[in-house]
């Protein structure tokens, strides 16, 4: 008998701006998508195409996030765990087991769960969750780029690249920036001195 398993993964722990996203995905027993692997190993075009196929074929899926304010008040690790719990809680179909990418399990899931290091390359449900979390995170960055094109969010996706750091210096900190992350915090501290 097929056990309903969910894979859970996150996207956006490292960037200086925006939410951290998590996805939970339950796939059918017969699911097969050639080329599905860790989202970081896929081109954006391939990831977007796979995301649509996953959404269409999954038994159930849900994407959730924790905001920059929650990241600041909880810290990035706890905000990531919160986003993961929200993703699992948002599933309309309850899995019997959960596989989570990494080495930590969110508290209070009330479902048997196992952390799998590099799970996004080993377990297809985690690979699928990785793709959905990453495409949701990228969509947030494209929306932010529409509102603030001078920051280049569509190119660097919020990571602390040279372009992003220079834009931060030149244009300042946005409400969506993570104030507890060192480059943003340091810039705010410098501005407070003048």
From Swiss-Prot:
One GO CC term on file: ribonuclease H2 complex
Keywords carried by this UniProt record: Cytoplasm, Endonuclease, Hydrolase, Manganese, Metal-binding, Nuclease
Domain of life: Bacteria
GO aspect biological process, one term: DNA replication, removal of RNA primer
Major localisation: cytoplasm
Binding-site positions, a divalent metal cation: 9-10, 101
Domain RNase H type-2: residue ranges: 3-193
Enzyme Commission number: 3.1.26.4
Cofactor: Mn(2+); Mg(2+)
Subcellular location: Cytoplasm
Free-text remark on how the cofactor is bound: Manganese or magnesium. Binds 1 divalent metal ion per monomer in the absence of substrate. May bind a second metal ion after substrate binding.
GO molecular function: manganese ion binding; RNA binding; RNA-DNA hybrid ribonuclease activity
Catalyzed chemical reaction(s): Endonucleolytic cleavage to 5'-phosphomonoester
Cross-referenced InterPro entries: RNase_HII, RNase_HII/HIII, RNase_HII/HIII_dom, RNaseH-like_sf, RNaseH_sf
NCBIfam families: PRK00015.1-3, PRK00015.1-4
Function, as annotated: Endonuclease that specifically degrades the RNA of RNA-DNA hybrids.
Protein name as catalogued: Ribonuclease HII
Biological source species: Neisseria meningitidis serogroup B (strain ATCC BAA-335 / MC58)
